[in-house]
Amino acid sequence: MGRGCAGRRLLLRALPLSVSEPSLSRSRPASPPKVLPQAVKCYKHFLESCLENGDGVGEALACNSIGVDYQLMGEAYVKQAIQYHTKHLEVADVPGKYIAHVNLGLCYAALAMPEEAVANHQHALRYAIRMCSLAGESLACGNLGLIASAGEGDIPTAKACAERQLQLARTLNDNRGKGDAYRQLGVLSNIQGAHDEAVHYFEQAMQLAQQEGDEHVSNSARCCIGVAKGNASFDDYISGMVAHAADATAGEHH
């Protein structure tokens, strides 16, 4: 079921360096923030009608739409979003199940439940591979990488995910996907102390953003370049101070 609405689904992706714009998979454009509660109410009426008439396609569409709007309404509504994305998962076709798992992964990440988030993004990845969807696989890898890098993080896993995302984005000629991956690789390289490598990745991200006319991402990448260069200079300064202190100590012993 759900093949009729599968073609209408629009996949929206977030910037890895932004926590304010959730990466939501939705069946239609987002509702303006001020009308979200009313939109939820309308979609619930639509859902009731679908249930009464045995319309599985409409039921999947309604559950997805309600879940997404609850996510957009903020953290206080994430648990309600999970309820509807779970219902969506139960009635959806394979593309719909991919979408439901992506959204459930995002919800659990918002609730600081990384194990549940990872499990759902892994399911999404499996469905993407099953559908032979390189774009879906790229997004799933990106989401898994972001969770792996959170907090103390599993940096090797996060880097492997970002590298796979970059590979897929190149295959798809997806500039935004490449930019996402480059920024994530830059962040991870900076964490590992490979600041010159981080600068390279951020410069790639900035160039892609400029090509796409995305001033916000371009400026963000430019700031990250400055941070990475600053970290590199600081490391050089500390190394110089240590070497100077070692030379001074050696001189005192002579």
What are the residue ranges of the model-derived segments?
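Residue-level detector of the short coil/turn that links helix A to helix B
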Residues: 34, 74-76, 112, 152-153, ...
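Alpha-helical linker/edge segments of TPR/alpha-solenoid repeat scaffolds
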Residues: 150-153, 187-191, 225-241, 248
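Amphipathic alpha-helical segments of tetratricopeptide repeats
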Residues: 45-52, 86-90, 123-130, 164-174, ...
